Amino acid sequence: MTAPSQVLKIRRPDDWHLHLRDGDMLKTVVPYTSEIYGRAIVMPNLAPPVTTVEAAVAYRQRILDAVPAGHDFTPLMTCYLTDSLDPNELERGFNEGVFTAAKLYPANATTNSSHGVTSIDAIMPVLERMEKIGMPLLVHGEVTHADIDIFDREARFIESVMEPLRQRLTALKVVFEHITTKDAADYVRDGNERLAATITPQHLMFNRNHMLVGGVRPHLYCLPILKRNIHQQALRELVASGFNRVFLGTDSAPHARHRKESSCGCAGCFSAPTALGSYATVFEEMNALQHFEAFCSVNGPQFYGLPVNDTFIELVREEQQVAESIALTDDTLVPFLAGETVRWSVKQ
């Protein structure tokens, strides 16, 4: 990576955790990712969820149809794990190059997760098959029991689900997605080479004070929820250390404005337009720009066993204002950092 003071040239990055939705929303948001990223792991939590090879093939085609001419973008599809999923269907999708990974949502943990897994035991045959064929498991790591505080759900998941699972299936490759706590940062750092993590821009830039002090900021509300500043700092220190099993996963999750700014608002930040510059800002603040390219463009492919991208992009360090909103057919979409001045942006 070359880093003159005002320009960062890096190998084209990938987004290892992305929501593209479907229909008109899909057509609106895809270009914001495809113009920057070479590949993206696409989440399967549609309604109904993507649980078959045929559904994934059809969804992939809808995504590709929304990619503008001149963008070189490959969506990497995932299978939504359910209690009733057939291991043979999963293996077929993996062998045919349709499924790159499978996603574990604890039932009702986040948007469109009501079909999720009720217990690890219920999907053990599927997980055993994944371990056997080398298919990565992507985990939304929160317990969902009503009696457990929302700020404690990730830490409790580690001790009650993640560690027992990894002890039981020692060869299973696991990505602990969108980690938000010091507990998770320490757990991944101390784990073996079969455990990795993604981190979102909002969890590196903000903590729960930013979301709640002086008024509720619904466009910072996501799941897992922002935590206290000691957890934010642990995440920042993990990425700044150059640790090679943590990588870019925006968890960009678009919702129309009226679904965010509501008496019962949806969780998710639409960060695709601003995420890469946000990450660059964090790495610069941590005096760690020398590790920025690996986080964005190398660590993910390395863990997944895929080649790195062979093209490059540039970010420029000049103040730019983020758009207040993006037009949808019958509403607007508010991007992460809407209306704010950002320090780094992708060179057009």
UniProtKB/Swiss-Prot annotation:
One of its GO terms (molecular function) is zinc ion binding. Keywords: Hydrolase, Metal-binding, Pyrimidine biosynthesis, Zinc. CDD domains: DHOase. Binds 2 Zn(2+) ions per subunit. Zn(2+) 2 binds at K103, H140, H178. Its EC number is 3.5.2.3. The keyword NADP does not apply. The keyword Zinc applies. GO terms for cellular component: cytosol. Zn(2+) 1 binds at H17, H19, K103, D251. Substrate binds at H19, L20, R21, N45, H140, L223, H255, A267. Its cofactor is Zn(2+). GO terms for biological process: 'de novo' pyrimidine nucleobase biosynthetic process; 'de novo' UMP biosynthetic process. The active site is at D251. It catalyses: (S)-dihydroorotate + H2O = N-carbamoyl-L-aspartate + H(+). Pathway: Pyrimidine metabolism; UMP biosynthesis via de novo pathway; (S)-dihydroorotate from bicarbonate: step 3/3. It is an enzyme of class 3 (hydrolase). Homodimer. Catalyzes the reversible cyclization of carbamoyl aspartate to dihydroorotate. This is Dihydroorotase. It comes from Shigella dysenteriae serotype 1 (strain Sd197). The gene is pyrC.
